[in-house]
């Protein structure tokens, strides 16, 4: 059944921004629309990930605070590994923090 991803993205982003939820996890068809919507929120760094290594890099280098996965293009097994990688990987900081500090307009 079709749904409007902004109806889910905005409450999730607000919950992460408020510190009520950390990190956030979203699953959508391709993941693109919900990731774009999430990233409209100040302080949100939603990363579209479909493999473990992408999820690790999203945390290590980008300090992503919401994991977005493409439900149509990821198996349940790969989704499980991707979530585990995202949740267990710390942010490296250093030069990556400097880059993140340059994101807000």
Describe each model-derived feature in a short phrase:
Residues 1-5:
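Short beta->alpha junction loops
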Residues 26-72:
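Mid-chain, well-packed structural core segment of small domains
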Residues 52-105:
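C-terminal binding/interaction regions
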Residues 9, 31, 35, 79-80, ...:
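A general structural signal for well-ordered alpha-helical segments in protein cores
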Residues 7-30:
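Short, structured active-site "lid" loops
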Residues 15, 37-41, 85, 102:
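Alpha-helical structural signal in soluble globular domains
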